Regions:
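Acyl-donor (CoA/ACP) binding surface of acyl/acetyltransferases
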Residues: 1-18, 22-27, 61-176
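Residues at alpha-helix boundaries and short interhelical turns
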Residues: 34-37, 54, 78, 95
Length: 176
């Protein structure tokens, strides 16, 4: 993992301007898949949500320059018998297609399974989002099903494919 081009780090209020500018510049790229925070108030609300026990999130940043290339969140972390979380993620358009989110996802999966001791990660992806589906496939996620009108995005209910990765399946592929 030492040869990765990215690192994960927790977002802070100091990231606000860079984050907001990156999300505004990526608006077309994100539509219709996701609506990340694009204002100071929305970014502050995002930071506040990450302080809740069942949410965790990281910026994916270039090693060296620290530029934000994406975001990966672990949402609705459920403990006890479930030990699971739902992934949410998005790239900054300028850095898309370079494999950087794949590297960030590798680090996130490692963090979730090793540090947080989760058993299952789930990603719910709109069927037309081929880049996102390719990312989770490359990371070892398996398609488990289809959820009709699963999530409301941009004021419309959207169908999603359900993809999941279990800790025991990941550990067989983890070489670091």
């Amino acid at each position: 993992m030492a040869d990765l081009r990215v690192i994960l780090r927790k977002p802070t209020i100091a990231d606000g301007d860079e984050f907001i500018n990156a999300m505004k510049a990526s608006r077309r790229f994100h539509r219709p898949w996701v609506q990340p925070p694009r204002s100071a108030a929305a970014f502050t609300a995002y930071l506040k949500r990450l302080r809740i026990a069942d949410h965790d999130g990281h910026l994916v940043c270039l090693r060296g320059s620290g530029a934000i290339v994406g975001v990966i969140n672990l949402n609705h972390i459920i403990r006890r018998a479930f030990q699971s979380a739902f992934l949410g993620y998005y790239a900054v358009a300028e850095y898309a297609g370079q494999g950087l989110m794949f590297e960030g996802m590798q680090l996130t999966v490692r963090y979730a399974f090793r540090r947080l001791k989760l058993h299952r990660l789930e990603a719910n992806i709109q069927p037309g989002n081929s880049a996102s589906i390719a990312l989770v496939k490359r990371c070892g996620f398996l398609r488990e099903g289809f959820s009709r009108r699963y999530l409301k995005i941009d004021r419309q209910w959207s169908d999603h494919e359900r993809w999941a990765l279990l800790a025991e399946n990941w550990s067989a592929h983890d070489t670091a």
